[in-house]
């Protein structure tokens, strides 16, 4: 019986952690999930290549969608690498 209680407690804790992460990063997670479903695009050119991403991020362009996004260095996050992690 103790192992069932331990398992139940672990499941509850895991659900709480996931729920709080989704509440905090839900919108970003949706965007990342959508991006992961698509190809990674190509490296940006022109003005976007040097100015779209902040804090050392790498700009990517998905031509078929007309969208730009950034691959951020480890200590930044956000659509344009504009938010400091942690």
UniProtKB/Swiss-Prot annotation:
Residues 40-82 form the EGF-like domain. It holds the Pfam family EGF. Keywords: Cleavage on pair of basic residues, Disulfide bond, EGF-like domain, Nematocyst, Secreted, Signal, Toxin. GO terms for cellular component: extracellular region; nematocyst. Residues 1-23 form the signal peptide. Belongs to the EGF domain peptide family. This is OMEGA-stichotoxin-Shd4a.
């Amino acid at each position: 019986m103790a192992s069932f209680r331990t398992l139940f407690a672990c499941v509850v804790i895991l659900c709480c952690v996931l729920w709080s992460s989704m509440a905090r990063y839900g919108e970003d997670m949706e965007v990342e999930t959508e991006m992961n479903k698509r190809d990674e695009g190509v490296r940006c050119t022109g003005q976007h290549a040097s100015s779209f991403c902040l804090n050392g991020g790498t700009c990517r362009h998905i031509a078929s969608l007309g969208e730009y996004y950034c691959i951020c260095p480890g200590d930044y996050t956000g659509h344009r690498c504009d938010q400091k992690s942690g």
